[in-house]
Amino acid sequence: VKVQAMAVQQEEDGMIFCLVDCLPGEYPMNSTRTNEGGYEESDLRKKLNSEILNLFPAELTDMMTPFDSGDLLRLPTEKEIFGGNYYGEYESPYVKQWKPRKKRRNRMAFDGTKDENLQWYWLMNKIRESAPSFSSVNSDGYAYYYIASYSLGVRPVFKIKNIV
């Protein structure tokens, strides 16, 4: 799979990158209609750090450094994309919107196929007022949410460690 990533935020231990577009294919957040356990216990989190991570070349994964969760890949959060929590659980005041995501076009993503259809994609926040749903970005680049057992696009985030 050939993908492009954009640098979105510098941290002490590395640079965070987010894919420019979604991976080919769609994935459910969970196999059932629930957000119980949040992203941390979701089927998609497990899949991201196994079968999806295995799609990345070793030259890239060797340069990755884990996030605080221990994961090499994760989904973006609602606040990183939109600068606030419109539907999802509230995030720390220290989480800021990534500068490139202030432009709506940079929140939009294609589906990873040669047809280049605009794609809805998952965010990691579970919805406050809806037991079966998680936050998402719609094809127009706006905040929304979707039922966890439905399949949407995936736009992974990873961190490349600083070279000392």
Locate predicted features:
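Collagenous Gly-X-Y triple-helix signature in extracellular proteins
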Residues: 1-164
